[in-house]
Design a protein with these regions (language model features):
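An acidic, low-aromatic, low-complexity terminal/linker signal
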Residues: 1-159
Length: 159
């Protein structure tokens, strides 16, 4: 293996949602944890079904399966805790997965203009072509209506 080829290889975590596999850059993964109690409460954030408590943090649970496969998950094997970026800030988000996760090294092909915004690129692994997910586009953020609502709430809360 040449030095130039080694530089192009990146680490990815393969995750299973139903029958399909997806990939996330390993740099975005904090940990993989067993399912725990999801605390549900009234809120206005779409795609967030509740929160879990992990290592002293409140971590939002975001089931992205419906956006990716067209079906909501009925069972969960693990939560993949990923790092979501909001501008200059970061936050953990828990993604429910239905099967084992796998760490692989591979060369990612960049997404094209015709690809959906949640696709960061593509991997070829074991004869399959796998979507590499752009979590910033797939999970809810502080942009648009949510950002305006949060800013309005922050201004109203000031003395």
């Amino acid at each position: 293996m040449t030095a130039s080829l080694e530089l192009e290889l990146q680490s990815f975590v393969l995750l299973r949602l139903g029958e399909r596999r997806f990939a996330v850059s390993a740099r975005q993964i904090a940990e993989l944890v067993a399912p725990s109690s999801v605390f549900r409460f009234p809120h206005h954030t779409p795609k967030i079904e509740g929160v879990i408590l992990r290592r002293g943090r409140i971590v939002p649970v975001c089931d992205v399966s419906e956006a990716l496969t067209g079906e909501r998950l009925t069972s969960r094997r693990f939560y993949l805790i990923a790092v979501r970026r909001y501008g200059a800030q970061t936050e953990w988000v828990a993604l429910p997965v239905t099967g084992e996760c796998e760490l692989i090294n591979g060369e990612m092909t960049a997404a094209g203009e015709a690809d959906a915004p949640h696709v960061a690129g593509w991997l070829s692994h074991d004869g399959d072509v796998i979507e590499v997910l752009n979590l910033d586009a797939l999970t809810p953020g502080t942009d648009g209506v949510l950002g305006e609502r949060a800013a309005r709430g922050a201004l109203e809360a000031r003395p």
